[in-house]
């Protein structure tokens, strides 16, 4: 149900949930349009596409909600651009590499597996590059283009709160927050984007979440958290992320700046095999999986 105007509402009658089953990932290859990077499907059957060029992205959900589906669907969709060097990805995984460590080859110089000095230095490096690019583009380009001679930069942060909220060193925490705010507020034109993944949407955890132009609410614990992620009044306009069942990881409500109503969508289901395929595709390597030979007893003996 949506309020179209005062005194007028619009109703959708759904007879079956088109997002109830996992969505298999498309084949690797093809071209990439950074203005429409498909990572899944909406409940109306349309592609769920992120406008990576000019956007900043925040995905919030409880453990098991499917944040990894958003991450790996995006990286698979970007595979041709990663392979050609058009897009360069950096990563910080303070959980010791439990997520990004599945495919470290995809990340420039490898992911950082902590929330300490190395993570902060990477954030500050990208913040400086954001400012430097803006200076180089000034008077020449209005913004990043595929032909500008520099790669589009994507920074993946999993888990974001460990970097800007749970860091116990006050100076590192302040430096990390300052650098990240520079990237998210100034990265649009220079071609620098952030995908932040987090479980806790409270304002004290992410005080500058308004700088993320696309906010993705996967399964949440409480109704109040929906408006924390998507904005005031979005839950009343249908964005019931707190009602997403545990059986549908990857289902989310998505709110983009400039659009009044949220969209319900589901990210592709990316398996471990799909991630291995992605690494081989991007790095130009190949691998064949062979069945382990069966061992048979010989001359009446027993197999070891």
State the predicted function of each range.
Residues 143-144:
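Periplasmic polypeptide-binding modules associated with outer-membrane biogenesis and secretion
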